[in-house]
Design a protein with these regions (language model features):
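The conserved beta1-alpha1 loop
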Residues: 25-27, 95, 213
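Gly/Ala-rich beta-loop-alpha elbow adjacent to hydrolase catalytic centers
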Residues: 94, 98, 102
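Flexible "cap/lid" loop of the alpha/beta hydrolase fold
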Residues: 107, 114-145
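Conserved alpha/beta-hydrolase catalytic His-Asp/Glu region
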Residues: 127-128, 147-204
Length: 269
């Protein structure tokens, strides 16, 4: 892990491997650890994996005064890429609300992105926002109880033992109260209007795109979210065995799809 200081935030970043860069953006309420089963396979395949914790999420810091909504997250991700001084444009693979960040990055500066992979991502105002409403309203004074509650709810989020184990591990941090406060703040930062406003822009101008989906995703179903999202980008939709937390359920399948897609892109000039 490395710590990268930007103008107004400090990011916790897992950066491993050599080769074509893949920027990995996770979804709520996980962290860079969502990609722990994917990154070794990408490294073995000759790729560089860059998995940051979003600002104010996970172990990345952001002052309380700052808006940590997805538009600012997109700005910080570009600043991170600038700081890393990459030799070529990255492919972005993004899950859940990480896909909102990726879509905003495309809308802001599509020429800086070589390719886009959206994994069980958000589409327009379909953010499964109902699942986080109770977290938004949680009393910060009782934050220390939140992670215990979420730990008991992981079975409702996924039938997969792999997802349940991974989610419990990500929620079982040493400083429970601080972690819970970050989760509450993250939930409060979610605003589906940010992706509704850029739909037509994305339809007109975007890099080559692949959409990956878990066949049993109960939060963002493939029929109502995955297919419209793929249609927006004119992208192939590939369905893999697993649920919403596909990188935990099917890490080898996700890594193989990322590798195949990245190798299919035209070479950088």
């Amino acid at each position: 892990m490395i710590r990268i200081s930007l103008a107004d935030v400090d990011l916790n970043v897992c950066d491993s491997g050599q080769g074509h860069p893949i920027l990995l953006l996770y979804g709520f309420p996980t962290s860079h650890l969502l990609w722990r089963g994917v990154m070794p396979a990408l490294e073995d395949a000759g790729f560089r994996s860059i998995a940051p914790d979003l600002a104010g999420f996970g172990e990345s810091d952001a002052p309380e005064r700052l808006d940590i909504g997805m538009a600012n997250q997109a700005r910080w991700m570009f600043a991170l890429l600038d700081e890393l001084r990459l030799d070529e444009r990255p492919v972005i693979a993004a899950h859940d609300i990480g896909s909102a960040v990726a879509q905003l990055m495309v809308a802001r500066n599509p020429e800086r992105i070589r390719g886009l992979i959206l994994i069980d991502g958000v589409y327009a105002d379909n953010w499964a926002i109902g699942e986080v409403e109770s977290i938004r309203a949680w009393d910060p004074a009782a934050a220390s109880r939140l992670l215990k509650l979420l730990g008991r709810r992981v079975r409702a989020w996924s039938d997969s033992p792999a997802s349940q184990e991974g989610l419990r591990e990500m929620l079982a941090v040493d400083e429970a109260e601080g972690a819970a406060l970050r989760i509450i703040r993250a939930a409060q930062s979610m605003d589906p209007r940010s992706t509704v406003e850029i739909l037509e822009q994305l339809r007109r101008d975007h890099p080559p795109t692949l959409v990956l989906w878990g066949e049993s995703d109960r939060f963002l179903p493939v029929e109502s979210v995955g297919k419209p999202l793929a249609a927006l980008f004119g992208a192939e939709l590939k369905v893999l065995p697993g649920g919403h937390f596909l990188p935990l359920d099917c890490p080898r399948g996700v890594a193989a799809a990322i590798e195949s897609f990245a190798r299919s892109l035209p070479p950088e000039l």
